């Protein structure tokens, strides 16, 4: 890719700008441009689409997304040290890369982007889950994004695609599979990163559904699921006791045995319970 976009290899970029990954920001830099190109291809055809990228760092994935033909990339970066490297990419792709210095949790990205919108990111580990839940629980169908292509620790990725009854099954699996079709697209070893994390990483691809698999209010479903799995080893009548008065009556109304545990409930059952609670 260095030959394609005329930009130097990422190791040279990092050396030139004296960049080092900050543990406090959850940073791990992915330097192999062949890998970032593979990740950039996961969403599919990006021509005519805008892409939101969170935590671009020195810009490896950014370069991949632009090379894949993204109409525009909005890169939100909290670390000011990375901005000169990103501006260097912006100069190579005039009018197609906009960089915002800030916290992705506080920036309304939709104000800067036009549909269709994809999200792709090597997410900072310390905010990745919070951002994902936010993207999975807007009130609107379909959501503002078409696909999410996100890198996480492999353990988190496995939680997103987990099935009922497994140890990994929980809030992320239910919200992700309610909102989207989710799959692990590829797995990356620790040595692909600088510094090398202690665990493998994985890229998760989520394709937004145009309507929910089962009707439910996003906020209510999120609250029910979070409460149920906060004490996942307890029976539902105990784990959900503080959620709303008369929880056993609500469970009975939708045919769920109150002695079951959260990890045994299907997505359909959680949605039925959320509808029942919302109806009062």
Swiss-Prot record:
EC number: 2.1.1.182
Gene3D superfamilies documented for this protein: Ribosomal RNA adenine dimethylase-like, domain 2, Vaccinia Virus protein VP39
Recorded GO MF terms: 16S rRNA (adenine(1518)-N(6)/adenine(1519)-N(6))-dimethyltransferase activity; RNA binding
A Pfam family per the record: RrnaAD
Alphabetized SUPFAM superfamilies for the sequence: S-adenosyl-L-methionine-dependent methyltransferases
Binding, S-adenosyl-L-methionine: 28, 30, 55, 77, 103, 122
Reaction catalyzed: adenosine(1518)/adenosine(1519) in 16S rRNA + 4 S-adenosyl-L-methionine = N(6)-dimethyladenosine(1518)/N(6)-dimethyladenosine(1519) in 16S rRNA + 4 S-adenosyl-L-homocysteine + 4 H(+)
Broad class of the protein's primary localization: cytoplasm
PROSITE patterns: RRNA_A_DIMETH, SAM_RNA_A_N6_MT
GO cellular component terms given for this protein: cytosol
Keyword DNA damage attributed: no
Superkingdom classification of source: Bacteria
Compartmental location: Cytoplasm
Keywords recorded for this protein, A-Z: Cytoplasm, Methyltransferase, RNA-binding, rRNA processing, S-adenosyl-L-methionine, Transferase
Keyword check for Ribonucleoprotein: no
Physiological role: Specifically dimethylates two adjacent adenosines (A1518 and A1519) in the loop of a conserved hairpin near the 3'-end of 16S rRNA in the 30S particle. May play a critical role in biogenesis of 30S subunits.
Family from the record: Belongs to the class I-like SAM-binding methyltransferase superfamily. rRNA adenine N(6)-methyltransferase family. RsmA subfamily.
Stated name of the protein: Ribosomal RNA small subunit methyltransferase A
Species annotation: Dinoroseobacter shibae (strain DSM 16493 / NCIMB 14021 / DFL 12)
